[in-house]
Design a protein with these regions (language model features):
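Conserved active-site tyrosine of GNAT-family acetyltransferases
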Residues: 132-138
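Conserved acyl-donor/pantetheine-binding loop and adjacent beta-alpha core of acyl/acetyltransferases
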Residues: 58-90, 96, 148-149
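A short beta-loop-alpha structural element at the N-terminal edge
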Residues: 1-14
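C-terminal "cap" of GNAT-fold acetyltransferases
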Residues: 18, 126, 139, 146-179
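Conserved GNAT-fold acetyl-CoA-binding loop/helix
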Residues: 17-40
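Conserved GNAT acetyl-CoA-binding A-motif
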Residues: 112-125
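A short helix-loop-beta-strand connector motif used in the catalytic cores of GNAT acetyltransferases and
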Residues: 39-51, 61, 68, 85
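Conserved acetyl-CoA-binding loop-helix of GNAT-fold acetyltransferases
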Residues: 91, 97-110, 135
Length: 179
């Protein structure tokens, strides 16, 4: 994992387009209309956009990691607690057997612990993604109905993890986990 740079734009465009193709083939809503915005995140001056870079495949994941979450979905007490907030995770479906989304999430859990931040939080729009996030150790805190979306608010305590094998080999899929 490393911070995204402008030099990553073409690889991120490739990975987002591949994910859009994958989603569309399955009849799922795609991010194709947001492709340019997702690629533009590589130029984010706030230094909160990270990529998972593979020696073999190039950039295989992108994720936003911020120290402040959205103003909705979390209680005032939760918002007052230090946490890393994950959003905008996109992975290359060509390497899904290595579970790059899980690799990125576990990296964030370890990073939070190294920074002394007790929580990693995230939200998602689909129950299938919430189930996948649970395989990464996240728990469902609550659901929140927004105007046009039902959100699954999820959290996991930070902890130090030995990520050597995870980065080298990916993480094995659990039975029934095809993501």
């Amino acid at each position: 994992m490393r911070l995204a740079t402008s030099a990553d734009r073409s690889q991120v465009a490739r990975l987002v387009a591949a994910r859009c193709d994958w989603m569309e083939r399955r009849g799922l809503p795609s991010w194709r209309d947001s492709l340019d915005d997702l690629v533009a995140q590589c130029d984010n001056p706030d230094g909160d956009v990270w990529v998972l870079d593979s020696d073999e495949h190039g950039v295989v994941g992108q994720m936003v990691v911020q120290d402040q979450g959205p103003p909705w979905g979390w209680t005032a007490k939760e918002r007052a607690e230090p946490a890393l907030y994950l959003s905008g995770s996109v992975t290359d479906p060509a390497v899904r057997e290595r579970r790059p989304g899980t690799v990125m999430a576990l990296w964030a859990v370890d990073r939070a612990a190294r920074l002394g931040v007790p929580w990693v939080r995230r939200h998602c729009h689909f129950p299938e993604v919430a189930r996948y996030n649970r395989t990464q150790g996240f728990t469902l805190v609550r659901t929140e109905q927004r105007t046009h979306a039902r959100l699954f608010m999820m959290a996991r305590r930070a902890e130090r993890l030995d990520l050597t094998r995870v980065f080298r080999e990916g993480t094995p899929a659990q039975p029934g986990q095809g993501r």
